């Protein structure tokens, strides 16, 4: 029984973000569709070759996506919302981009599909839309074309397909309500057709992703798996693939399915290998997800070997990444600025492929010398002084309940804040960032590269901040922001100013579409050596009589959007960050900043996948926010911002944050989210986002007014704020000015009644 290895997927964007650049060039009309398609082909060929050279036996094909793999699946099934359909019924790459972005080089602009987080990761997918009586047919053959490409290059191909039950689970019903699971029998014929096409091509194994099987699914959904897979069996071998959690709670459902193998995430799940081996049918292959696809740490391969060695020779076995390597940067070897000791602790996607090759070889031969050698740096890290800071650990241990309580309740604070700020009804503001123009990015890059001295850099940033204040005053906004010209990324910026983080040059991972992020890496205990945001906030406030918000990224979001340490709990990391930022709140307040926004867009996405684990997470997540904010005086108004959230199931925790104002992303869901605030009788102030900043389309005054009137039916108008959904960093100034002018006009119209 020779053990093979494979990955569940590989990063798509390219080492130098070639895909991002090609997409954006095409969208801007600066390159042709053929040029874009060529970049995709080149990247796929390179990535297959790189995995093969690193020692991967079975290459994933179908993991590449032009925007998002769930959206690719929607097109495969012919699920195109009517507003995005071509008049002749055809589907092309612009159809896909219109669903994702609201517009493309061809076709009519229309509202983009809703976007939300892929399980509990930082990747986003476009939510499939379902309507009653919908028809499906094989429409977009990207998967088959890419399989042909890989076969022509002589690769050992393992196609990757998002499974039918998970696909339906991830979608939403539009219009007349019905049970979307009832569409299962309508989509299965398309899956059968795809599997038949793959069988024709001589494909042996297909990786069919059903990550919904790690969730606490309703019984009807669990029951749907058997008939679904009964319909799909027989054409090729199916590797039922799960990730992000364990499968033990749903193992009875899984073992009844007519598949030939199961992939389990042995990093994030608590499944016991011996127990899995005992309960799985003896002729099934087990794919052991031993290498973490979601982090950047070098694996202790001696531990991984010990975890799996007892079942070697007892059943067919593959070793694999825990999930797709999409969530990891591509190649550590191009990082030239990382300190050698710290660098030795990491492994990016290509190094993880190498780890899988080492593990496969050791399991096949029994020789573990190479594993011990590879694991030595990560074992040595446990005793490094760069990891442990006794002062931070002591401060954390001394936290009391008092440290997470504001001095007075919201009603008392609100009165003090009204007296201080004297804001009109329907106060207008933005979420924080303004367009990051080429000038701003060039300024930061020149400074970073040493081509610009500190004085000239600061003069340049000050000028961009001044322009942002002038723009906002001209537009008539009530509460201003400094625009964040000095910040490359809302998490990276804070990480750069906190001890305990390190940064990469090319550690990019895809967030959605062409958006990539370069997450900081938490390597040790976290502290704040000096104030971070005070100087620029104070400068911005000196330019205007209107209040300027201080802007902080909250502790849970910094944690969720960084690569965390694996040797301490997430709670410990979050509270260390909270203590560091608590000092920042105190310093902003002392500098005369009266409104401080602590963004927590990631609070909900950090939720464990199983509801039974939610309470513990929410308890420490809320406590971290409160530790951060509680130092503020009564007349300092604390705002928080959250995006892509469904709130109804965590409303208690949202209220427990005790922020004076919460701004939320609601425009894509047509104010649906406010339902939860209404039902809960949310006591504090709310700014429901009135337009979608992820789309370049400019909302009309009437559209915004209608949304605000809708909001006022649910929340008393005196507690409503008016703001966009999210920061405006990725937008251009022309559409930003136009959209904000319409937003301010809508608020003024409502004030006049």
Swiss-Prot record:
<feature type="binding site">
    <location>
        <begin position="515"/>
        <end position="516"/>
    </location>
    <ligand>
        <name>5-methyltetrahydropteroyltri-L-glutamate</name>
    </ligand>
</feature>
<feature type="binding site">
    <location>
        <position position="561"/>
    </location>
    <ligand>
        <name>5-methyltetrahydropteroyltri-L-glutamate</name>
    </ligand>
</feature>
<feature type="binding site">
    <location>
        <position position="599"/>
    </location>
    <ligand>
        <name>L-methionine</name>
    </ligand>
</feature>
<feature type="binding site">
    <location>
        <position position="599"/>
    </location>
    <ligand>
        <name>L-homocysteine</name>
    </ligand>
</feature>
<feature type="binding site">
    <location>
        <position position="484"/>
    </location>
    <ligand>
        <name>L-methionine</name>
    </ligand>
</feature>
<comment type="pathway">
    <text>Amino-acid biosynthesis; L-methionine biosynthesis via de novo pathway; L-methionine from L-homocysteine (MetE route): step 1/1.</text>
</comment>
<dbReference type="GO" id="GO:0008270">
    <property type="term" value="F:zinc ion binding"/>
</dbReference>
<dbReference type="InterPro" id="IPR002629">
    <property type="entry name" value="Met_Synth_C/arc"/>
</dbReference>
<keyword id="KW-0479">Metal-binding</keyword>
<keyword id="KW-0808">Transferase</keyword>
<feature type="binding site">
    <location>
        <position position="484"/>
    </location>
    <ligand>
        <name>L-homocysteine</name>
    </ligand>
</feature>
<feature type="binding site">
    <location>
        <begin position="431"/>
        <end position="433"/>
    </location>
    <ligand>
        <name>L-homocysteine</name>
    </ligand>
</feature>
<dbReference type="Pfam" id="PF01717">
    <property type="entry name" value="Meth_synt_2"/>
</dbReference>
<keyword id="KW-0028">Amino-acid biosynthesis</keyword>
<dbReference type="GO" id="GO:0003871">
    <property type="term" value="F:5-methyltetrahydropteroyltriglutamate-homocysteine S-methyltransferase activity"/>
</dbReference>
<dbReference type="InterPro" id="IPR006276">
    <property type="entry name" value="Cobalamin-indep_Met_synthase"/>
</dbReference>
<feature type="binding site">
    <location>
        <begin position="431"/>
        <end position="433"/>
    </location>
    <ligand>
        <name>L-methionine</name>
    </ligand>
</feature>
<keyword id="KW-0489">Methyltransferase</keyword>
<protein>
    <recommendedName>
        <fullName>5-methyltetrahydropteroyltriglutamate--homocysteine methyltransferase</fullName>
        <ecNumber>2.1.1.14</ecNumber>
    </recommendedName>
</protein>
<feature type="binding site">
    <location>
        <position position="665"/>
    </location>
    <ligand>
        <name>Zn(2+)</name>
    </ligand>
</feature>
<feature type="binding site">
    <location>
        <position position="643"/>
    </location>
    <ligand>
        <name>Zn(2+)</name>
    </ligand>
</feature>
<feature type="binding site">
    <location>
        <begin position="17"/>
        <end position="20"/>
    </location>
    <ligand>
        <name>5-methyltetrahydropteroyltri-L-glutamate</name>
    </ligand>
</feature>
<comment type="function">
    <text>Catalyzes the transfer of a methyl group from 5-methyltetrahydrofolate to homocysteine resulting in methionine formation.</text>
</comment>
<feature type="binding site">
    <location>
        <position position="641"/>
    </location>
    <ligand>
        <name>Zn(2+)</name>
    </ligand>
</feature>
<keyword id="KW-0677">Repeat</keyword>
<feature type="binding site">
    <location>
        <position position="117"/>
    </location>
    <ligand>
        <name>5-methyltetrahydropteroyltri-L-glutamate</name>
    </ligand>
</feature>
<feature type="binding site">
    <location>
        <position position="726"/>
    </location>
    <ligand>
        <name>Zn(2+)</name>
    </ligand>
</feature>
<feature type="active site" description="Proton donor">
    <location>
        <position position="694"/>
    </location>
</feature>
<dbReference type="GO" id="GO:0032259">
    <property type="term" value="P:methylation"/>
</dbReference>
<keyword id="KW-0486">Methionine biosynthesis</keyword>
<dbReference type="GO" id="GO:0009086">
    <property type="term" value="P:methionine biosynthetic process"/>
</dbReference>
<feature type="binding site">
    <location>
        <position position="605"/>
    </location>
    <ligand>
        <name>5-methyltetrahydropteroyltri-L-glutamate</name>
    </ligand>
</feature>
<dbReference type="InterPro" id="IPR013215">
    <property type="entry name" value="Cbl-indep_Met_Synth_N"/>
</dbReference>
<dbReference type="InterPro" id="IPR038071">
    <property type="entry name" value="UROD/MetE-like_sf"/>
</dbReference>
<keyword id="KW-0862">Zinc</keyword>
<dbReference type="Pfam" id="PF08267">
    <property type="entry name" value="Meth_synt_1"/>
</dbReference>
<comment type="similarity">
    <text>Belongs to the vitamin-B12 independent methionine synthase family.</text>
</comment>
């Amino acid at each position: 029984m020779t053990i093979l290895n494979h990955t569940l997927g590989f990063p798509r964007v390219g080492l130098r973000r070639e895909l991002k650049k090609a997409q954006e060039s095409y969208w801007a009309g600066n390159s042709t569709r053929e040029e874009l398609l060529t970049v995709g082909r080149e990247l796929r060929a390179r990535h297959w070759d790189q995995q093969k050279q690193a020692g991967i036996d079975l290459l994933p094909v179908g993991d590449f996506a032009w925007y998002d793999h769930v959206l690719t699946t929607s097109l495969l099934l012919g699920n195109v919302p009517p507003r995005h359909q071509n008049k002749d019924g055809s589907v092309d790459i612009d159809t896909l981009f219109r669903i994702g972005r609201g517009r493309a080089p061809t076709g009519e602009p229309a509202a983009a599909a809703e976007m939300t987080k892929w399980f509990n990761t930082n990747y986003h997918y476009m939510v499939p839309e379902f309507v009653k009586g919908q028809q499906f047919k094989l429409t977009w053959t990207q998967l088959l074309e890419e399989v042909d490409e890989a076969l022509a290059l002589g690769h050992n191909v393992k196609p990757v397909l998002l499974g039918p039950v998970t696909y339906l689970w991830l979608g939403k019903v539009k219009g007349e309500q019905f049970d979307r699971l009832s569409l299962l029998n309508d989509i299965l014929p398309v899956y059968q057709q795809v599997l038949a096409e793959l069988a024709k091509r001589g494909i042996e194994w297909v990786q069919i992703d059903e990550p919904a099987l790690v969730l606490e699914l309703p019984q009807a959904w669990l029951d749907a798996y058997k008939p679904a897979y009964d319909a799909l069996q027989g054409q090729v071998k199916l590797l039922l693939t799960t990730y992000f959690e364990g499968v033990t709670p749903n193992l009875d459902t899984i073992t009844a399915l007519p598949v030939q193998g199961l992939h389990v995430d042995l990093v994030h799940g608590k499944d016991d290998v011996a127990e899995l081996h005992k309960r799985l049918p003896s002729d099934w292959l087990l794919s052991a997800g031993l290498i973490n696809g979601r982090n950047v740490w070098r694996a202790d391969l001696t531990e991984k070997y010990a975890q799996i060695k007892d079942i070697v020779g007892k059943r067919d076995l593959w070793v694999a990444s825990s999930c797709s390597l999409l969530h990891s940067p591509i190649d550590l070897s191009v990082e030239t600025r990382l300190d050698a000791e710290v660098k030795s602790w990491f492994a990016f996607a290509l190094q993880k492929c190498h780890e899988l090759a080492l593990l496969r070889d050791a399991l096949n031969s029994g020789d573990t010398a190479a594993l011990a050698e590879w694991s030595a740096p990560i074992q040595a890290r446990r005793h490094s002084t760069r990891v442990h800071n006794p002062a931070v650990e002591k401060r954390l241990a001394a936290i009391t309940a008092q440290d997470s309580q504001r001095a007075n309740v919201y009603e008392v604070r609100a009165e003090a804040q009204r007296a201080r700020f004297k804001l009109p009804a329907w106060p207008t503001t933005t979420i924080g960032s303004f367009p990051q123009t080429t000038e701003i990015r060039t300024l930061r890059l020149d400074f970073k590269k040493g081509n610009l001295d500190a004085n000239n850099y600061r003069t340049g940033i000050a000028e961009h901040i001044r322009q942002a204040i002038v723009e906002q005053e001209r537009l008539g906004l009530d509460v201003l922001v400094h625009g964040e010209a000095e910040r490359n990324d809302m998490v990276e910026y804070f990480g750069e100013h906190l001890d305990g983080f390190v940064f990469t040059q090319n550690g990019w991972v895809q967030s959605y579409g062409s958006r990539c992020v370069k997450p900081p890496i938490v390597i040790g205990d976290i502290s704040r050596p000096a104030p971070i945001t005070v100087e620029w906030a104070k400068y911005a406030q000196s330019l205007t009589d209107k209040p300027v918000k201080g802007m902080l990224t909250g502790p849970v979001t910094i944690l969720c959007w960084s690569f965390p340490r694996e040797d301490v709990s997430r709670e410990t990391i979050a509270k260390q960050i909270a203590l560091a930022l608590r000092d920042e709140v105190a310093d902003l307040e002392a500098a005369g900043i009266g409104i401080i926004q602590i963004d927590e867009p990631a609070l909900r996405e950090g939720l464990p996948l199983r509801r039974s684990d939610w309470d513990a997470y929410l308890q420490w997540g809320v406590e971290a926010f409160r530790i951060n904010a509680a130092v503020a005086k009564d007349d300092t108004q604390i705002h928080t911002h959250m995006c892509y959230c469904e709130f109804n199931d965590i409303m208690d925790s949202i209220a427990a944050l005790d922020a004076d104002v919460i701004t939320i992303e609601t425009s894509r869901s047509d104010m649906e989210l406010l339902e939860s605030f209404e039902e809960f009788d949310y006591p504090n102030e709310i700014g429901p986002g009135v337009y979608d900043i992820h789309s370049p389309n400019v909302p009309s005054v009437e559209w915004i007014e209608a949304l605000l009137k809708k909001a006022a039916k649910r929340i008393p108008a005196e507690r409503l704020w008016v703001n966009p959904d999210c920061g405006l960093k990725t937008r251009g100034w022309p559409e930003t000015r136009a959209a904000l002018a319409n937003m301010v006009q809508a608020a003024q119209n409502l004030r006049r009644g």
